C-alpha cells in the first residue's frame, strides 16, 4: 500500500514538472511588476527610505526613477551608482539589481502631503514593464532650518557637478585668452604703463606692482561673479526651462561665431574710450594708481574675451554659489595676469612672436564656446541627438585642427596629424550610425502596415471592421528594446510578412503611458512589453497564442503557423 502511495506521489510531481514543457512558446513566464520590483517605504521624521526588492533576472533603470513631492519640500535625491547595462538601441544605461535603497530628506511636509514615485524596469529575457507610479503618504514634518542648511549645500554641489567644467578650468581659460591676438600684443604696453615708464625698478618692486594690477583686475571680475551668482540663485529654475536653454544656446553660438571672426563683439567705442582715459589718468608706478588701472581694465572687454567670459558667467549663474562665482572669476583674472607678470619680470624675451598662431588660438576657443550650446541643448533634445551634436562638433574641430596642422613643416607634426585624423574618424561614427540607421529604420517600418489604435473603443471598432478576418495587435513603446527588435529583425522577415498577409494588423503605441494607455493594458490584462495578441474572426482573443517577450523571425513564423486562429 505504501508503495502505491509513493508511486502516485511521483506521478503527480512528474506531471506538474513536465507540464511546462508543453506550454505555448509565447505564453507569459513573467511576474507582475509589483513582484518583480517589490516597493516599500519607511519614514522617520525628516528621513524617508524608499526600497525596492528586485527579483533575480530583473533590473530597474536609474534614469527612470523620479520623485515628485505634493505639499512637501524635499532635498534633491542622491541616487546611488548602478551597474552598466548595454543594448543595441539605447547603448549604455545604469541599472539596479537585487536591492535598491534610496534615502530622501524631507525638509517640510504639510498634513496630507504625499510623494509620487515613478520607476521602470525590465527583465533580462527582453520584457519591459510600463512606468510604475506609487504614492507615498508622508507624516507631517515641520521645517528645520538647521537641518535644511546642509541640504542646500548639497544641492549646490550637485548642480555644480552637472556642469561641463570645474572652477579650475577658469584659470586655464584665462591663460589661454592671454595668447589671443586681442590680448597678447598689449602686454608689453601694459607692462610699461604699470611700471610708470621707470626702467630701473628692482625685480621685487616690478613684480609687486604687476601683482597689484592683476589684483585690481581680479577685483572687478570677482565682483561680477558674485553678482551673477546671486542672480543665479533667483533664476536657477528659469535656466532649466527649454525656451531659456534654446535661447542661451543661440546666444553662445553667436558668441562662438564672433571667435571665428564673422563679426566683432565689444563694448561701444565711446565707453571704451572713457574707460581708457580714466585708466591713463592714474599714476603708473604707484600701488594705488596701478590697482585702479587694473580695476578699470577689468571693465574693458575685448572681442577675444567677451565669448569666454560669457561662458564662465553662465557656469556661475547655474551654480548659484556665491563662493564659486567669485572664486571662478578670480582664477580667470589670475590666469590672464600670469603672462603679464612674467613679461614684467623677465622682459619681452619670454613673449612669443606674433603671427597667425594667435588667430588659431582664438578659433580654438570658438570651438570651446560651441560646446556650451551642445551641453545646453542636450537637456532639451535628449541623449541621442545630443550625442549626434557632440559628434558633429568633434568632426568640425578635429577636421579644422588637421587642416591647420598641414601648414607645419616639422616632421613630428606628422604624428599629430595622424592622431587628429583618427580622432575625426572616431568622432564621425555616431553620425554614420544615424545616417545608415535612419535609412534602415525607415525601410523596416514600411514592411508591415499597422493601423494605429489608442483606446479600448478604437480596438473594439477595429475588431468589428475586420469583418471576419483574423487580427494581430502589437503593443509597442519607444522604451521597449524588444519591441524595436521585433521591428528590425522579425517583422521585416519575408516569411513573417507572408504568414501575416491575410491578417489585419493593429498597433498600439503606449510610449506615453497615459490614462488611455493604462486603461488599454488593464483591459487586455497585459503586464508589460513586448506583447502581441491574436484575435479570431469573431473578435475573441486566443490567449494561448499571446506572445510575450522577443521572438526571432523563425520562431515567430512557426508560432504563426501553429497558433494563429
From Swiss-Prot:
Residues 434-565 form the Thioredoxin domain. Keywords: Cell inner membrane, Cell membrane, Cytochrome c-type biogenesis, Disulfide bond, Electron transport, Membrane, NAD, Oxidoreductase, Redox-active center, Signal, Transmembrane, Transmembrane helix, Transport. It catalyses: [protein]-dithiol + NAD(+) = [protein]-disulfide + NADH + H(+); [protein]-dithiol + NADP(+) = [protein]-disulfide + NADPH + H(+). It comes from the Bacteria. It is a multi-pass membrane protein. Residues 1-19 form the signal peptide. It comes from Shigella boydii serotype 4 (strain Sb227). GO terms for cellular component: plasma membrane. The keyword Transcription does not apply. Disulfide bonds join 122-128, 182-304, 480-483. It is found in: Cell inner membrane. Pfam families: DsbD_N, DsbD_TM, Thioredoxin_2. Belongs to the thioredoxin family. DsbD subfamily. The gene is dsbD. This is Thiol:disulfide interchange protein DsbD. The chain crosses the membrane at residues 163-183, 208-228, 243-263, 296-316, 323-343, 357-377, 384-404. Required to facilitate the formation of correct disulfide bonds in some periplasmic proteins and for the assembly of the periplasmic c-type cytochromes. Acts by transferring electrons from cytoplasmic thioredoxin to the periplasm. This transfer involves a cascade of disulfide bond formation and reduction steps. It is an enzyme of class 1 (oxidoreductase). One of its GO terms (molecular function) is electron transfer activity. Its EC number is 1.8.1.8. One of its GO terms (biological process) is cytochrome complex assembly.
